[in-house]
């Protein structure tokens, strides 16, 4: 397209005033450096070499304290980091999640075993951190690049943290209403930038121009974040997702908010839509 055409139809990008310290989720690989020390951080580009880093400026400052706690625990009890070349070792990743509005914290260790040795000692230290709500392990014993396995076991607290997404209106993005609450597990898909998510969803809702008479389909709905947000203005919302646990979470999120005009289906979008449409008729 010609640049002048693009300029004529493109609206101004809605940016962030402070584009730092916003990520509500982080996943840190655990391994050894060249000197054999246990480290965590991020992979160098196109490699599986970990660059030690405990304090990414996009993440929350609390991540550093969590990682220090985990690494100190591993050193004290001689818990081995995972070695992907040999498929040996225990701790593969440290996953953290944060509720932007609730200030709740989740820590989940991805491990190469069915049990974490000395787990009680780790819990004893992590619960000292402000806002700690959920401590769990995720079991992944496969030789794979996929971070999370299928099974999660709670070590302390709840399996979930809770967060809210608020409707924002006007040029200054004023909050309207109490927001929609969401339960978030280690495996849940949830937008990582809570500030921009509210702007994005509110803009989508405004563009939809819902009057309260429409039926809306949300394909690949995950835990129902967009579905339940749109349910505030739609007559009926239908969500479709292939992951059963995500749909279970979506239904629980609807109950959590007292939303009765949202229905969720498990299956492929291409299979569900036609069949569900006939049923709804």
Predicted regions and their residues:
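Rossmann-like S-adenosyl-L-methionine
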Residues: 118-120, 124-281
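SAM-dependent transferase fold signal centered on methyltransferase-like domains
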Residues: 1-162, 167-180, 202, 206-213
């Amino acid at each position: 397209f010609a640049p002048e055409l693009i300029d004529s139809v493109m609206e101004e990008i809605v940016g962030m005033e402070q584009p730092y310290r916003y990520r509500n989720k982080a996943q840190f690989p655990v391994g050894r450096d060249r000197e054999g020390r246990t480290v965590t951080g991020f992979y160098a580009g196109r490699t599986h070499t970990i660059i030690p880093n405990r304090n990414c400026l996009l993440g929350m400052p609390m991540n550093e304290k969590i990682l220090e706690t985990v690494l100190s625990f591993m050193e004290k009890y001689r818990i081995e980091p995972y070695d992907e070349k040999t498929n040996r070792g225990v701790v593969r990743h440290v996953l953290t999640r944060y509720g932007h509005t609730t200030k709740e914290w989740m820590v989940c260790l991805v491990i190469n075993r069915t049990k974490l040795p000395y787990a009680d000692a780790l819990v004893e230290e992590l619960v000292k951190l402000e806002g700690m709500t959920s401590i769990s392990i995720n079991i992944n014993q496969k030789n794979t690049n996929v971070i999370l396995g299928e099974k999660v076991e709670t070590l302390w607290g709840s399996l979930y943290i809770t967060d809210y997404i608020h409707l924002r209106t006007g040029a200054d993005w004023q909050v309207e209403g109490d927001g929609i609450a969401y339960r978030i597990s280690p495996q849940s898909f949830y937008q990582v930038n809570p500030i921009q998510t509210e702007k994005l969803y509110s803009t989508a809702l405004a563009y939809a121009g819902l009057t309260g008479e429409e039926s809306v389909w949300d394909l690949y709905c995950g835990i129902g974040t967009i579905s339940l947000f749109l349910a505030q203005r739609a007559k009926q919302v239908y969500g479709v997702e292939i992951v059963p646990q995500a749909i279970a979470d979506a239904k629980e999120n609807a109950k959590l908010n007292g939303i009765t005009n949202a229905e969720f289906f498990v299956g492929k979008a291409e299979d569900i839509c036609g069949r569900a449409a006939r049923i709804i008729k």
